[in-house]
Swiss-Prot record:
Encoding gene per record: rpsR
GO cellular component: cytosolic small ribosomal subunit
Keyword Nuclease: no
Pfam families reported in the protein's UniProt record: Ribosomal_S18
Taxonomic lineage from the root: Bacteria, Pseudomonadati, Pseudomonadota, Alphaproteobacteria, Hyphomicrobiales
UniProt key word Flavoprotein: no
Polar residues compositional bias, start-end: 1-10
Record's protein name: Small ribosomal subunit protein bS18
Cross-referenced SUPFAM superfamilies: Ribosomal protein S18
Keyword vocabulary terms for this entry: Ribonucleoprotein, Ribosomal protein, RNA-binding, rRNA-binding
Gene source species: Bartonella tribocorum (strain CIP 105476 / IBS 506)
Positions of the UniProt region annotated as Disordered: 1-21
Purpose of the protein: Binds as a heterodimer with protein bS6 to the central domain of the 16S rRNA, where it helps stabilize the platform of the 30S subunit.
The protein's assembly and partners: Part of the 30S ribosomal subunit. Forms a tight heterodimer with protein bS6.
Length: 82
């Protein structure tokens, strides 16, 4: 009985909602030539990191994916990292 009282008195874990790093006045522009920026959103294996991990909005995630794919096509980024 006391165990349930202790659980109810504790505040549940509340995760703060992340904001998109590309929204805002001082946010960087997504550009296929900006390799340093694009590499932050690529995993160690060379895959594009999903937006649920990076907190990028859906619209900006599409722009980011297209910029990464364009940079790969032009040879600025590798397709696979060994």
């Amino acid at each position: 009985m006391t165990d349930t009282n202790q659980n109810s008195s504790r505040r549940p874990f509340h995760r703060r909602r992340k904001t998109c790093p590309f929204s805002g006045a001082t946010a960087p522009k997504i550009d296929y030539k900006d390799i340093k920026l694009l590499q932050r959103y690529i995993s160690e294996r060379g895959k594009i990191v999903p937006s649920r991990i990076t907190a990028v909005s859906q619209k900006k995630q599409r722009e980011l994916a297209n910029a990464i794919k364009r940079a790969r096509f032009l040879g600025l980024l590798p397709y696979v990292i060994k």
